[in-house]
Amino acid sequence: MVMVTQKIYIELKAFDSYLLDRSARSIILTAKRSGARVNGPIFFPRRVAKFIVNRSTHVDKKSREQFEIRTHKRLISLPKANSTIIQALMSLQLPAGVDVKVKVIGGSNG
């Protein structure tokens, strides 16, 4: 039987770093239980978007409010993933605050 191996990149984004790390840990444990070799999690720089608005509606320019959104990002790489690993990852339940993007590369036989 010929097994098709693929390279998989799993990119995780979240506003809460605790949720993100917990999700990355569960993905890594699931992949290792299925027999995959795992690279990561690779930490990306935190992105901070700042919004500054006036407190008053008309005057008093010196009185302002600052808000920020911090976006945390991680990357997990599975260099040689087969169908059993993909099925195990598909059945994984992740929290609602985590954005998951999966990129599958290749399909070399062997």
Curated annotation (Swiss-Prot):
Disulfide bonds: none annotated. The keyword Ribosomal protein applies. One of its GO terms (molecular function) is tRNA binding. Part of the 30S ribosomal subunit. The gene is rpsJ. One of its GO terms (biological process) is translation. Belongs to the universal ribosomal protein uS10 family. Keywords: Ribonucleoprotein, Ribosomal protein. Involved in the binding of tRNA to the ribosomes. It comes from the Bacteria. HAMAP family: Ribosomal_uS10. The keyword ATP-binding does not apply. GO terms for cellular component: ribonucleoprotein complex; ribosome. This is Small ribosomal subunit protein uS10. It holds the Pfam family Ribosomal_S10.
